[in-house]
């Protein structure tokens, strides 16, 4: 046998295997067979998470896996105290239910009394901002310069962005019955990522209004950790792809030669560049601007009375040069009580390897020649504290190659034919989101193909369960189409199941969740005539036009979305527009008749959600206009401090009861 024959056999075998795999994928798609744990895309950020763990000594780093085309993994259950408490609560509830079930027949010693520690005693309520957007893009791939800033409201940053797209691929026979085309997903995700990189989050910091700080004005560190981490992430890790470059020295000749160190809005000391009268060379001098009691010395991270030295040859040519630097949120953590005393900070800094992350937030306003001068002066070690020496040893030039991480990460991204649901969250919030699960339901061709249907995501944010459903329902203006849309909704509720490997009582169905948001192209139309609809639109009489809306009629009669809520429609119908135009399609007989309608909707179910506003965006990219809803949603946050206090009180009560029993 010639050497060519085995290669030909292997190539033929590989081709046959690919054909079998393609046929398997198509059959699974036709029959709407999905795995028990469906695949989805998510950002991989293990390296940065490890950096956060080393920098912040945080043991509860995120465990994200997967990527585009990879399988997202369900989060671990016992990653932090919150999950441990959730698991313990579930076990306690199960035990209580079992005790109640056998209470009639069980002996007295087997009966368990109810817990005296109420849930409200160790849970705090917190609001997060959720931006929900839906858009039918009509099968058009986005251009690289597509502007979606208004749609996602980057001027009002949210904690979570839930974005649902419909018809990301043309709904032709090849895309409906053939293998799934995921190329548009990467394009849309890139557009979304670039837009979110331009978001400037509003920072909420911890301020000290007294000097020295008053213990009563500070929250425990575990409660302020998220605020600090958010500030650090914004100052050090936002604006992905932005590199730090030296600034021209000549532009700063007119500025003062000083370096101000800030702490809670107050200047602690200043660094001046002076000229040595003996040598005529520039030197650096650090002076105290005001006196501080010795008992507060531990609050000064970078402290020195004075030091002098000779700069290098480069600095002699440019004269007096300095680096203006200001401490960012990362460095201020070490300045604020109740952090460890600073007499312990020096050895820790010297023992560690030079950290890029610690230095990169020092804002350089001069060239690296001035940095060389500072390093040369510090190298003489004339009574300079070890903290300053450690900073001098760090190579600021590495900042040139350091790129900042984005403030938002992709939590989950799932496609079914033309339906795409993608969720993005703040980096600081990611570790508080667990139990991410995905479910897909097709109700299209033959009642199972995914050209119509829903992509749903279940997750827990802190101690609260959320569910987001992106849907594309049956189209058409006939009465039978309206009935089919109602049937689609019932099928989605019936067949949406979130599987889990754990048995801790995680929600399986849509209505098992506490906060539910349903978005998408629901395709409910207006029952009014084309002429009457256009007349009411021209008069902007939205309340009268809303009386003909099929969806409003359906949930008022309880046939679909009974008990759900929606914001007031104070904007024109979102469908159907001419291409790249502000005009609705004309009823001229050349094209199928399309009466304008509010097809694109966002609904909510459950308590603890407050709608801020509900609007559409004037984006002419497709024949639909995108819709945005902003919610403030309550989440329950576990408080270890409150739980400890509650358990302490309970123990005291038990001891008192035992003492009374002994006395009796």
From Swiss-Prot:
One of its GO terms (molecular function) is phosphatidylinositol-4,5-bisphosphate 5-phosphatase activity. Residues 40-66 have a biased composition (Acidic residues). Pfam families: Exo_endo_phos2 (PF22669). Residues 592-607 are annotated as: Catalytic 2. It catalyses: a 1,2-diacyl-sn-glycero-3-phospho-(1D-myo-inositol-4,5-bisphosphate) + H2O = a 1,2-diacyl-sn-glycero-3-phospho-(1D-myo-inositol 4-phosphate) + phosphate; a 1,2-diacyl-sn-glycero-3-phospho-(1D-myo-inositol-3,4,5-trisphosphate) + H2O = a 1,2-diacyl-sn-glycero-3-phospho-(1D-myo-inositol-3,4-bisphosphate) + phosphate. SMART domains: IPPc. It is an enzyme of class 3 (hydrolase). Belongs to the inositol polyphosphate 5-phosphatase family. This is Type IV inositol polyphosphate 5-phosphatase 3. It comes from Arabidopsis thaliana (Mouse-ear cress). The gene is IP5P3.
């Amino acid at each position: 046998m010639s050497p060519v024959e085995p290669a030909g056999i292997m190539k033929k075998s590989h081709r046959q295997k690919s054909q079998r795999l393609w046929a398997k994928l198509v059959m699974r798609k036709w029959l709407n067979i999905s795995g028990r744990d469906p695949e989805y895309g998510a950002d991989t950020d293990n390296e940065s998470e490890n950096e956060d763990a080393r920098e912040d000594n945080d043991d509860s780093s995120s465990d994200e896996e997967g990527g585009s085309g990879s399988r997202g993994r369900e989060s671990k259950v016992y990653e932090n105290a919150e999950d441990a408490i959730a698991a313990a609560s579930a076990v306690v509830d199960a035990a209580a239910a079992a005790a109640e079930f056998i209470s009639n027949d069980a002996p007295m010693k087997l009966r368990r009394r109810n817990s005296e520690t109420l849930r409200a005693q160790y849970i705090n309520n917190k609001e997060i901002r959720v931006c929900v957007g839906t858009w039918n893009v009509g099968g058009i791939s986005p251009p690289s310069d597509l502007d979606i800033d208004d749609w996602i409201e980057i001027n009002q940053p949210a904690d979570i962005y839930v974005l649902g797209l419909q018809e990301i691929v043309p709904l032709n026979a090849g895309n409906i019955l053939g293998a799934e085309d995921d190329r548009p997903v990467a394009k849309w995700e890139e557009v979304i990522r670039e837009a979110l990189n331009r978001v400037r989050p509003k920072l909420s910091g911890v301020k000290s209004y007294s000097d020295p700080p008053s213990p009563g004005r500070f929250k425990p560190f575990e409660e302020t950790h998220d605020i600090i981490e958010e500030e650090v992430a914004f100052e050090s890790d936002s604006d992905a792809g932005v590199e730090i470059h030296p600034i021209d020295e000549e532009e700063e000749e007119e500025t003062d030669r000083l370096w101000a160190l800030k702490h809670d809005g107050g200047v602690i000391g200043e660094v001046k560049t002076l000229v040595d009268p003996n040598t005529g060379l520039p030197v650096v001098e650090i002076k105290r601007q005001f006196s501080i009691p010795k008992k507060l010395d531990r609050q000064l991270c970078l402290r020195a009375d004075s030091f002098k030295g000779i700069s290098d040859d480069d600095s002699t040519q440019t004269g007096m040069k300095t680096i203006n630097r200001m401490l960012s949120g990362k460095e201020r953590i070490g300045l604020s009580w109740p952090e460890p005393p600073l007499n312990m900070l020096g050895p820790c800094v010297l023992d560690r390897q030079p950290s890029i992350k610690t230095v990169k937030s020092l804002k350089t306003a001069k060239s690296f020649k001035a940095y060389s001068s500072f390093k040369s002066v510090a190298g003489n070690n004339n009574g300079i504290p070890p903290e300053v020496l450690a900073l001098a040893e760090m190579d600021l030039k590495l900042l040139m190659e350091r790129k900042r991480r984005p403030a938002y990460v992709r939590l989950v991204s799932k496609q079914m034919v033309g339906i795409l649901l993608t969720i993005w969250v703040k980096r600081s919030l990611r570790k508080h989101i667990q139990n991410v699960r995905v479910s897909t339901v097709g109700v299209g061709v033959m009642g199972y193909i995914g050209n119509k249907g829903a992509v749903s995501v279940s997750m827990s944010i802190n101690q609260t369960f959320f569910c987001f459903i992106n849907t594309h329902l049956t189209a058409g203006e006939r009465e039978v189409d309206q009935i089919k849309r109602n049937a689609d909704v019932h099928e989605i509720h019936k067949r949406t199941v979130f599987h889990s490997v754990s048995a801790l009582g995680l929600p399986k169905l849509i209505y098992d969740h506490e906060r539910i948001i349903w978005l998408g192209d629901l395709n409910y139309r207006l029952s009014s005539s084309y002429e009457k609809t256009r007349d009411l639109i021209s008069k902007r009489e939205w309340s009268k036009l809303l009386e003909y809306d099929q969806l409003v009629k359906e949930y008022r009669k309880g046939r679909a979305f009974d008990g759900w809520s929606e914001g007031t429609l104070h904007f024109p119908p979102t469908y159907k527009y001419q291409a790249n135009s502000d005009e609705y399609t004309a009823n001229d007989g050349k094209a199928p008749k399309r009466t304008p309608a509010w097809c694109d909707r966002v609904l909510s179910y459950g308590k603890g959600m407050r709608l801020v506003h509900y609007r559409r965006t004037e984006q002419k990219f497709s024949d639909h206009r995108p819709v945005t809803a902003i919610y403030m949603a309550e989440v329950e946050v576990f408080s270890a401090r409150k739980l400890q206090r509650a358990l302490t009180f309970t123990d005291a009560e038990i001891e008192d009861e035992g003492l009374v029993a002994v006395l009796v």
